[in-house]
Curated annotation (Swiss-Prot):
Subunit structure: The complex is composed of two ATP-binding proteins (LsrA), two transmembrane proteins (LsrC and LsrD) and a solute-binding protein (LsrB).
Source organism of the structure: Yersinia pestis
Keyword flag Cell inner membrane: yes
Entry GO terms, CC: plasma membrane
NCBIfam families named in the record: PRK15038.1
Biological function: Part of the ABC transporter complex LsrABCD involved in autoinducer 2 (AI-2) import. Probably responsible for the translocation of the substrate across the membrane.
Topology in membrane: Multi-pass membrane protein
Name recorded for this polypeptide: Autoinducer 2 import system permease protein LsrD
InterPro entries: ABC_transp_permease
Localisation: Cell inner membrane
Main location: membrane
Transmembrane segments: 7-27, 45-65, 67-87, 90-110, 118-138, 162-182, 212-232, 240-260, 261-281, 288-308
Molecular-function annotations in GO: transmembrane transporter activity
């Protein structure tokens, strides 16, 4: 009983994930093939890598919607640096530093201006996206053309396995462990929850708000850079639009995973399960021949249903009291 009280939503998500796979398996038996389930994660698991630190950002009461553009910028930067003759062993760490810098720019602007993080990251979304297109043009790859020619050892990396699991999935699992420990087993993680519950109380308690926010947004930038590197390796080319479609699925996964969009609560494990739930939903719909437009609409409907359902769950006692008052009024009338 205590386990269900503590991890009730995560257990619900796990049950829904199993049910989803079984239902799609009735329409297409390939969905029940363990190899298909494992290797199809490479198509969406990079969304999960970004969604994990994004969960911590949202729990802190913030938001970052610029990570898609950060992915594109990091991908193009990796391509340009490689074109310039820099070895991949140096280009990859430099790309991670660019991602961290993008996150620190977000944090710095939020702390310095005091403007809502949504507005700041909306601006940097266009800033980073425009910078990616500019760099793409300077490299000779006009529009959304990619930069190719990467060494085979790099392009094969995201398609290799470790202990029978795809490399991107292994990296995702390591990230889940890392962020779970950071969020639920460290003082920094407790600070994240306290800042999200009340930034004023956190400030009066002398919590390191600036340092914590810088850490969170920098981690989101680093995760975006890691996703960019994996995507470039997976597709074999660096393009400025690689993260363009990540925003909606990532936020859906975070909210579906149990994070309060206003801050103060959230779960890394819940987000990880929600990533798989949303990812397999897209995969399953494609396998049964559902058009992309309908698939996107269903993802949006899922997000709305989750928000409404969580709101009803959190305020069920108020709803119950309201219904009781209505019944009392009808009885007295």
């Amino acid at each position: 009983m205590n386990l269900y009280r503590r991890y009730g939503w995560e257990l619900t998500l796990a049950a829904l994930l199993v049910l989803e796979i079984l239902l799609f398996g009735l329409s297409n038996s390939r969905m029940l093939d363990i190899n298909v389930l494992l290797f199809s994660t490479s198509d969406f698991i990079c969304i999960g890598i970004v969604a994990l630190p994004l969960t911590m950002v949202i729990v802190s009461g913030g938001i970052d919607i610029s990570f898609g553009s950060t992915i594109g910028l990091c991908a193009i930067f990796l391509g340009i640096v490689f074109q310039a003759g820099v070895p991949m062993s140096v280009a990859i760490p430099l790309t991670v530093l660019v991602g961290a810098l993008c996150g620190l720019i977000n944090a710095g602007l939020i702390l310095y201006t005091g403007v809502n993080p949504l507005v700041i990251t909306l601006g940097t979304l266009y800033l980073f996206g425009g910078s990616a297109l500019l760099l793409s043009g300077l490299s000779g790859a006009t529009g959304y053309e990619g930069i190719g020619g990467f060494p085979a050892a790099f392009t094969d990396f995201a398609n290799q396995t470790l202990f029978g699991l795809p490399i991107p999935l292994v990296i995702f699992m390591l990230c889940v462990l890392l962020f779970w420990l950071l969020m639920h087993r460290t003082h920094s993680g407790r600070h994240v929850f306290l800042i999200g519950q009340s930034s004023r109380v956190a400030r009066y308690s002398a919590l390191p708000i600036a340092r914590t926010l810088c850490m969170l947004y920098a981690m989101t930038g680093v995760a975006s850079a890691i996703s960019a590197i994996l995507l470039v390796s997976y597709f074999g080319s660096a393009r400025s639009d690689l993260g363009a479609s990540f925003l909606m699925p990532a936020i859906t996964a975070v909210v579906l995973g149990g994070a309060n969009i206003y801050g103060g609560s959230g779960s890394i494990l819940g987000t990880a399960l929600a990533v798989l739930l949303v990812g397999y939903l897209q995969q399953g719909l494609q396998m049964i021949g559902t058009p992309n437009q309908i698939s996107s609409a269903l993802s949006g409907a899922l997000l709305i249903l989750v928000v409404v359902g969580r709101s009803i769950s959190l305020h069920r006692h108020l709803i119950y009291e309201w219904l009781q008052r209505r019944r009392s009024r009808k009885a007295s009338a």
